[in-house]
Regions:
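N-terminal helix-rich module
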Residues: 1-22, 27-51, 55, 59, ...
Length: 155
């Protein structure tokens, strides 16, 4: 009588399990290393956020059919206003923003008309407008193009 001997089987991990664990550890490790990387990481993130808020102000002006202003109040605070008061988005959130970690912004306002076109005073912009965001050791520039309102961020 031949009885299968299961007691002598080697126990361990399969190749797929080992590869999956190494892959997960690699992803987690790279995320941790990026957070510990030297340099002013928050400056880049804040410049991207400022650019997104410019696009958001433009989109809200078109959606609402009214002129809106990106109002840079101080070097570390800006808001989306109707020219007098800070507005709320469709979710009810007040559109007031503060830069973090000592990042500062050059003070210059921008108005969008109801078609989303950037204005300089009361007329269409004829040249690009720029804002400089400054961190501890570097700067980034956010620029908006005339007529289209295309926004770019450059280090």
């Amino acid at each position: 009588m031949d009885v299968a001997n299961t007691e002598n089987r080697c126990r361990g991990f399969t190749l797929i399990e080992l590869v999956a664990v190494l892959l997960i550890l690699g992803v987690l490790g790279s995320g941790i290393m990026l957070r510990w990387a030297p340099g002013d990481q928050s400056l880049s993130a804040q410049a991207d956020l400022f650019a997104r808020n410019l696009r958001h102000a433009q989109a809200m002006a078109m959606a609402r059919g009214v002129a809106l202003v990106l109002d840079v109040k101080t070097a570390s605070n800006y808001a989306i206003t109707d020219g007098t008061a800070t507005i709320r988005d469709s979710a009810g959130a007040l559109q007031n923003f503060t830069l973090d970690n000592g990042v500062t912004l050059s003070v210059s306002n921008l108005r969008f008309d109801s078609l989303g076109r950037p204005l300089n005073g009361g007329s269409l912009m004829s040249a690009a407008q720029s804002w400089t965001l400054s961190g501890e050791s570097s700067t980034e520039t956010v620029q908006i193009q005339p007529l289209t309102g295309f926004v770019t961020v450059t280090p």
